Swiss-Prot record:
Note on cofactor: Binds 2 manganese ions per subunit.
Biological process, per Gene Ontology: proteolysis
Catalytic residue list: 274, 348
Full protein name: Probable cytosol aminopeptidase
Catalytic activity: Release of an N-terminal amino acid, Xaa-|-Yaa-, in which Xaa is preferably Leu, but may be other amino acids including Pro although not Arg or Lys, and Yaa may be Pro. Amino acid amides and methyl esters are also readily hydrolyzed, but rates on arylamides are exceedingly low; Release of an N-terminal amino acid, preferentially leucine, but not glutamic or aspartic acids
Species assigned in the record: Rhizobium johnstonii (strain DSM 114642 / LMG 32736 / 3841)
Length: 496
């Protein structure tokens, strides 16, 4: 289970056992808090013996002598002070959280000599701790020997010069951690537990935070003409849902910003069935919907001054006797017809109806959709960047900047008529795949046909939402990618 960190901020710490974590830059002669924790100079001696250099996120564990005010000391290196970024403070917090074992209290000293630590940096450090403390072991019945188990709850005191400022900044950090970890939970849940109905129920729980949530049933979607989404769902005994979440934190007359997520709770590929190897990972094919749900959690928790809409299309793609076939032609809510070439190109069929519904009903300032849409984007970008496709240069630039700020990086991909014509169909208005070439681009062009003139961006997060490389702030298979990115976008550009 995740370790619960009870984080507080103070100008000083009462030391009586437990763990002390001290930060140190490469240039500083001593670490933050050394005069309080280590009057005997053990740290300096240990660092000299170990040839410790305080490189970025490099740790040094020190067993303290009897009579010391703490049981254990850990020094975390920050690297060169001049090169520190906001993300480095997150990483430092994650590195610190990874060292919290078999203790129920920890004091963290972050005001390094010669370095001004802002309240925002202190809050980022704490956010890094919360993100790293997450784990998903709900279904493990054997969790190691008792002596190896970490404490379920750890009281963490972060010692800094401006505790009031840090506490104020941290209120947003707690909201962000809650949203990211909610998204991680949703992606990590097994598919027999989290179906479309169950996912919709999770979205409904956001009402406790003040989010207005509507759940559209299959009958309601059929009445609206969502033939593309329903075509994907017809092969499963589990009924589809469309969850519509609204956070009304802005002015009443302000048009909302809108986020749409692909929520294929399990994707076999349908009749165009996937290979068996790795199919278990397709429980994460709802990573876009998870990110949108996590984002709405953040916006509501921190009372964001914005009107926001989150819409998630929830289906299961299965190959039963009633499943959609290659060659079928379906009619989308827009009235445009689609020839189904490959039933494993199903996410775009879900999204096209959700996008049209969102645009038609809410007339948003922009629409951003997130989807684990194509394997082609992983071939192009790997697990480092998500693919960004957009019809609007300003929105694209804002997203790119938010990606750099949050370290949830995006790379803009091309669009153009030469790609768009690859999805023209002989028998319908379009087909749902253009073949192997430029697969992520033709998928984006398919979605573009359903947004009209509204500023729009498509984030293909197939390489970043699940199974991405673990790092200082994420040790989870489901990363929660997109939550911090989009919160940063809203915070920087769209709050009144």
């Amino acid at each position: 289970m995740s370790i619960k960190l009870e984080i507080s901020f103070s100008k000083s710490a009462k030391l009586n056992g437990g763990l002390a974590i001290l930060l140190k830059t490469a240039e500083a002669d001593s670490a933050a808090g050394a005069e309080t924790v280590d009057p005997a100079g053990v740290i300096v001696k240990a660092a000299r013996i170990a040839r410790y250099s305080a490189k970025s996120m490099n740790g040094l564990d020190i067993v303290v002598p009897e009579g010391a005010p703490v049981d254990r000391i850990v020094v975390i290196g920050l690297g060169k002070a001049a090169e520190l970024t906001a993300h480095d403070w997150l990483k430092a917090g994650g590195a610190a959280a990874s060292r919290i074992k078999n203790t129920d209290k920890a004091a963290v000293f972050i005001d390094v000599p010669g370095l001004t630590t802002s309240p925002r940096a202190a809050a980022d450090f704490a956010l890094g701790m919360l993100l790293r403390a997450y784990s998903f072991d709900t279904y493990k019945t054997k969790k190691g020997d008792e002596e190896e188990k970490p404490a379920k709850s750890v009281k963490v005191t972060i010692v800094t010069a401006d505790p009031a400022g840090a506490k104020k900044a941290f209120s947003d950090s707690e909201a962000i951690a809650g949203g990211v970890n909610l998204a991680r939970d949703l992606v990590n849940e097994p598919p027999n537990v989290l179906g479309p109905v169950e996912f919709a129920a999770k979205a409904k729980e956001l009402e406790k935070l003040g989010v207005e949530v509507e759940i559209l049933t299959e009958r309601e979607m059929r009445r609206l003409g969502m033939g593309a989404l329903l075509g994907v769902a017809q092969g499963s005994v589990r009924p589809p849902r469309l969850a519509v979440m609204q956070w009304k934190g802005g002015k009443g007359k302000d048009r909302p910003v809108a986020f749409i997520g692909k929520g294929v709770v399990f994707d076999t590929g349908g009749i165009s069935i996937k290979p068996a190897a790795g199919m278990e990972d397709m429980k994460g094919d709802m990573g876009g919907a998870a990110a949108v749900t996590g984002l709405m959690h953040v916006l509501a928790s921190r009372k964001a001054a914005v009107n926001a809409v989150g819409i998630i299309g929830l289906v299961e793609n299965m190959p039963d006797g009633n499943a959609q076939r290659p060659g079928d032609i379906v009619t989308s809510m827009s009235g445009q017809t689609i020839e189904v070439i490959n039933t494993d190109a199903e996410g775009r069929l879900v999204l096209c109806d959700a996008l049209w519904y969102c645009n038609d009903r809410f007339k948003p300032q922009f629409m951003i959709n997130l989807a684990t849409l194509t394997g082609a984007i992983i071939v192009a970008l790997g697990n480092v960047h998500a693919g960004l496709f957009s019809n609007d240069d300003q929105l694209s630039a804002q997203l790119t900047a938010a990606g750099l700020s949050s370290n949830e990086k995006l790379w803009r991909m091309p669009l153009g008529r030469d790609y768009d014509k690859l999805i023209d169909s002989k028998f319908a208005d379009m087909k749902n795949t253009g073949g192997r070439q430029a697969g992520s681009i033709t998928a984006a062009h398919f979605l573009k046909r359903f947004v009209q003139d509204t500023p729009w961006a498509h984030l293909d997060i197939a390489g970043t939402a699940m199974g991405s490389p673990q790092d200082e702030i994420n040790q989870s298979w489901g990363s929660g990618f997109g939550v911090r990115l989009l919160d940063e976008l809203v915070r920087a550009h769209y709050e009144s």
